[in-house]
Amino acid sequence: MSILNLVRADLLNSQNYVPGGESARYRSHANELPWSPVTMGEYNLNYYPNIGLQIELQKQLAKRYQINSDQIILTRGSDDGIDLTTRLFLTAGKDAFMQFPPTFPMYAFYVRLQQAELIECPLDRRTNFRLTLDQIENSWKPNCKVIMFCSPNNPTGNLVDLNLIAKTCELYTNQSIIVVDEAYIEFANAPSATSLIGEFENLIVLRTLSKAFGLAGLRLGCIIAQSPIIQAFNKIIAPYSIATPSMELAKRALNNSDWFTKTIEQIKSSRAWVIKKFADNPIIEKIYPTETNFILIQTRFSKQLATWLARYGIAVRDFPSSSLLHDHLRITVGHDEQNQLLIDALSSFNADVAGLNYEKDFIY
């Protein structure tokens, strides 16, 4: 059985849109204006993005991720990759998508847009959200076309074991596409699932430049998979989907490897410092292990604390009262000044609850 049999049948034989005219001197085929009010280096912004620039950036990223250049395609951030995946594989009213909550809410959003079934396989906070193969097998159904791992997971911060990903790929060969969203993997002390791409044809890895690369404003990411799957994605990606300025700025930024190395180490160091300060705070009842640039904490004062921090201009992520994480906050590690303000604001909040003692369940 071909892995392409998992692609929606109505899309499998569709034709790619090929704009053409890339090398022509006079572009009389695309109805563009001959002038532009602004310029950007050698690129004419009055013209649609050049496919050559996209290929160059894909090759640059392929080298960084240690994959072949035919195993990658650009997206407008990870969200676009999630959207495209649900469109390519899920037939409305027929197919299902498995996720492991608490996790990134946009998975469920795009599944609903596609009118597919959502299979929930909840993680248990008592085990620090650890996932096992038994849990997956107990939740899987024959119509499950996509299994979505978020590693490290947002908002819990923990990794999915690479061996578990490999076993899942093997177990559901020709039955399910296994997707690994690695938006935060650069902050982790662990190998990427891209190392498994050559081994499993049903594996897709999503990467982004929005987090560790500090380029969220460019809206750039990529889908990584074996070549046949990438070719299938090409059938549903709109032409000219990535803007010329985004690609050009990303190319320049990716040349600055020293900056990325230094920045990631700085975040890791700051993360350790913030965790230590949290551990000394009596209102924080639990600190979860994290392999990301954020920290998940448990506190019975979550709603009050979020409101308190907002007075200092600090926005943190809290969760609905109906959520498993209703008494938790997700807090991003920032620069030194931002981190110090956070700790100072927490200390001032403590003054309002001084004298109260709570048992803590610290991981660190």
Swiss-Prot record:
<dbReference type="InterPro" id="IPR004839">
    <property type="entry name" value="Aminotransferase_I/II_large"/>
</dbReference>
<dbReference type="GO" id="GO:0004400">
    <property type="term" value="F:histidinol-phosphate transaminase activity"/>
</dbReference>
<dbReference type="GO" id="GO:0000105">
    <property type="term" value="P:L-histidine biosynthetic process"/>
</dbReference>
<dbReference type="InterPro" id="IPR015422">
    <property type="entry name" value="PyrdxlP-dep_Trfase_small"/>
</dbReference>
<keyword id="KW-0663">Pyridoxal phosphate</keyword>
<keyword id="KW-0032">Aminotransferase</keyword>
<keyword id="KW-0028">Amino-acid biosynthesis</keyword>
<comment type="similarity">
    <text>Belongs to the class-II pyridoxal-phosphate-dependent aminotransferase family. Histidinol-phosphate aminotransferase subfamily.</text>
</comment>
<dbReference type="Pfam" id="PF00155">
    <property type="entry name" value="Aminotran_1_2"/>
</dbReference>
<dbReference type="InterPro" id="IPR015421">
    <property type="entry name" value="PyrdxlP-dep_Trfase_major"/>
</dbReference>
<dbReference type="InterPro" id="IPR001917">
    <property type="entry name" value="Aminotrans_II_pyridoxalP_BS"/>
</dbReference>
<keyword id="KW-0808">Transferase</keyword>
<comment type="subunit">
    <text>Homodimer.</text>
</comment>
<feature type="modified residue" description="N6-(pyridoxal phosphate)lysine">
    <location>
        <position position="211"/>
    </location>
</feature>
<keyword id="KW-0368">Histidine biosynthesis</keyword>
<comment type="pathway">
    <text>Amino-acid biosynthesis; L-histidine biosynthesis; L-histidine from 5-phospho-alpha-D-ribose 1-diphosphate: step 7/9.</text>
</comment>
<protein>
    <recommendedName>
        <fullName>Histidinol-phosphate aminotransferase 1</fullName>
        <ecNumber>2.6.1.9</ecNumber>
    </recommendedName>
</protein>
<dbReference type="InterPro" id="IPR005861">
    <property type="entry name" value="HisP_aminotrans"/>
</dbReference>
<dbReference type="InterPro" id="IPR015424">
    <property type="entry name" value="PyrdxlP-dep_Trfase"/>
</dbReference>
<dbReference type="GO" id="GO:0030170">
    <property type="term" value="F:pyridoxal phosphate binding"/>
</dbReference>
